[in-house]
From Swiss-Prot:
Protein species of origin: Crotalus atrox
Inhibits platelet aggregation, as annotated region: 459-472
Record-annotated Disintegrin domain positions: 401-487
Secreted among keywords: yes
The protein's name in its UniProt record: Zinc metalloproteinase-disintegrin-like VAP2B
Domain Peptidase M12B: 198-393
PANTHER family in UniProt: ADAM A DISINTEGRIN AND METALLOPROTEASE DOMAIN (PTHR11905), DISINTEGRIN AND METALLOPROTEINASE DOMAIN-CONTAINING PROTEIN 28 (PTHR11905:SF32)
In-chain residues carrying the UniProt-annotated modification Pyrrolidone carboxylic acid (Glu): 190
Motif, D/ECD-tripeptide: chain positions: 465-467
Length: 609
């Protein structure tokens, strides 16, 4: 067990406040100059590591003293993290750099419950922190033989282009009732209890235009990508999702696809390349392309509800800002679409801040998802079961040695509740990361007051008729693995058949798309799926839309009968160019007695699984 090292750094505010200066983030109109002075409180004879696992900074912001607590983001890189670039003659060069002693941190401001921080300590302090509701940026001043830093509000960075920046995903909701319903729900501790952590293994690709923009400096590009993902990781922690960087590929000699200003074309090409090339070389869950090409009218585009799909678990992002925080928020936004999150409506809220999933980029980038985003994300996860993000990082996946006090449970630790000053776990000895005498457990869904829960105590609620509840064994603090009823078992009074823990029926799918008073349409509506046109088809093969055979028409586009007030649409359907798959009948849906949908065919349930 390695003892946590607490380091204090005093930053004295320089008496001069600048009026204007050009920094990495752009032209800044109002800033403070501070000088970091590192004061180390190490035991006599102790060897100071290059980058401590826990640090504390004292500094003045607007003349007021604040304390910034930082902890190393030990889950930033995966164990098998790799980097790929290309020689001038096109030869692939892949390396596996040692990244365990990295310099990327998350943190908070003391006595500010709503504060956040994402900081790189590689060469001075660079990043952002939120203090009393305002976003501040910090970075070293590039002065010879000087440790001067600039601290400034994000709002004081001059914006070169004041035009509104939009996400390219469009919504054709004919009813906003589902979003309104979600906005009225409250995130409860009980609801969170049944949401197991998810783990997204992210792969980044940087195009040739970005290489040119950075004058071929690959190290500069890599550092920027690390800082961006560190912030994305911070953002998703509050969604109970951990984002780890598993790979970075830089198209240093030439683009591997044709990158065009037309975002839809580029996203489609990138998805095809990921499916046929990248996935054959590197296992990952989600890929994002960063480009310096000026995308027409948008700054990002992604498929909706596509996480884990070989082609569609992708997004593209325009690197339109020099501020890493801004690009990180765009990346979190596009990945949010992959996780089933739509743009926020007027019903959605994230407190007093602008929310990440608003269609346009906020004048001040937010690091908060709305209540609607939370429920849409977890509705997608629980109902569509994207299996690739189920593998939670185990202790053996943490690439650096175990460190007591970093709030990560690692090999050799019985518990880890943070530093002794911050630990709030009555079962855990924060100094040793061992359970206190008499304690059986310190965490887990089957741990109550430091003891194993009684046998039979429900620890994971039933999410559907096909997903029975799990109960504690009385011998462990962990809830047993989530077990579903066998696929094909009848459910909902024979209206459907179980599929991956759900009972998919068309009525529920119509409700999810259009809200209340909408039902499965008459059979005649589904005959439109025999056309093989842009919306009516059963499946796609090599990019071509295949019309449904007569016996398969209920396994193509979903049609619903809208009986809501003021509506009279007997064959209502949903179609979007950005996400053609949305609005199709879901796999496993009953299409006839004894038959279910499988890959666009209506097949016998006995042979489907």
């Amino acid at each position: 067990m390695i003892q946590v090292l607490l380091v204090t750094i005093c930053l004295a505010a320089f008496p001069y406040q600048g009026s204007s200066i050009i920094l990495e983030s752009g032209n800044v109109n109002d800033y403070e100059v501070i000088y970091p002075r590192k004061v180390t409180a190490l035991p006599k004879g102790a060897v100071q590591p290059k980058y401590e696992d826990a640090m504390q900074y004292e500094l003045k912001v607007n003349g007021e003293p604040v304390v910034l607590h930082l902890g190393k983001n030990k889950g930033l890189f995966s164990k098998d993290y790799s980097e790929t670039h290309y020689s001038p003659d096109g030869r692939e060069i892949t390396t596996y750099p040692l990244v365990e002693d990295h310099c990327y941190y998350h943190g908070r401001i003391e006595n500010d419950a709503d504060s956040t921080a994402s900081i790189s300590a590689c060469n001075g302090l660079k990043g952002h922190f939120k203090l009393q509701g305002e976003m501040y940026l910090i970075e070293p001043l590039k002065l010879p033989d000087s440790e001067a830093h600039a601290v400034y509000k994000y709002e004081n960075v001059e914006k070169e282009d004041e035009a509104l920046k939009m996400c390219g995903v469009t919504q054709n909701w004919e009813s906003y009732e589902p979003i309104k319903k979600a906005s009225q729900l409250v995130v409860t501790a009980e609801h969170q209890k049944y949401n197991p952590f998810r783990f997204v293994e992210l792969f980044l690709v940087v195009d040739k235009a970005m290489v040119t923009k950075n004058n071929g400096d690959l190290d500069k590009i890599k550092t920027r990508m690390y800082e961006i993902v560190n912030t994305v990781n911070e953002i998703y922690r509050y969604m109970y999702i951990h984002v780890a960087l598993v790979g970075l590929e830089i198209w240093s000699n030439e683009d591997k696809i044709t990158v065009k200003p037309e975002a839809g074309y580029t996203l489609n090409a990138f998805g095809e390349w990921r499916k046929t090339d990248l996935l054959t070389r590197k296992k990952h869950d989600n890929a994002q392309l960063l480009t310096a090409i000026d995308l027409d009218r948008v700054i990002g585009l992604a498929y909706v509800g596509s996480m884990c799909h070989p082609k569609r678990s992708t997004g593209i992002i325009q690197d339109y800002s020099e501020i890493n925080l801004v690009v990180a928020v765009i990346m979190a936004h596009e990945m949010g679409h992959n996780l089933g999150i739509n743009h926020d409506s007027g019903y959605c809220s994230c407190g007093d801040y602008a929310c990440i999933m608003r269609p346009e980029i906020s004048p001040e980038p937010s690091t908060f998802f709305s209540n609607c985003s939370y429920f849409e994300c977890w509705d997608f996860i629980m109902n569509h079961n994207p299996e690739c993000i189920l593998n939670e990082p185990l202790g053996t996946d943490i690439i650096s040695p175990p460190v007591c006090g970093n709030e990560l449970l690692e090999v050799g630790e019985e518990c880890d509740c943070g530093t002794p000053e911050n630990c709030q776990n009555e079962c855990c000895d924060a100094a040793t990361c061992k359970l206190k005498s008499g304690s059986q457990c310190g965490h887990g869904d089957c741990c109550e007051q430091c003891k194993f829960s009684k046998s039979g105590t429900e620890c994971r609620a039933s999410m559907s008729e096909c997903d029975p509840a799990e109960h504690c064994t009385g011998q462990s603090s962990e809830c047993p693995a989530d077990v579903f009823h066998k696929n094909g078992q009848p459910c909902l009074d024979n209206y459907g058949y179980c599929y991956n823990g759900n009972c998919p029926i068309m009525y529920h799918q119509c409700y999810d798309l259009f809200g209340a008073d909408v039902y499965e349409a008459e059979d005649s509506c589904f005959e439109r799926n025999q056309k093989g046109n842009y919306y009516g088809y059963c499946r796609k093969e090599n990019g071509n839309k295949i019309p449904c055979a007569p016996e398969d028409v209920k396994c193509g586009r979903l049609y619903c009968k809208d009986n809501s007030p003021g509506q009279n649409n007997p064959c209502k359907m949903f179609y979007s160019n950005e996400d053609e798959h949305k609005g199709m009948v879901l796999p496993g849906t009953k299409c006839a007695d004894g038959k279910v949908c499988s890959n666009g065919h209506c097949v016998d349930v006995a042979t489907a699984y």
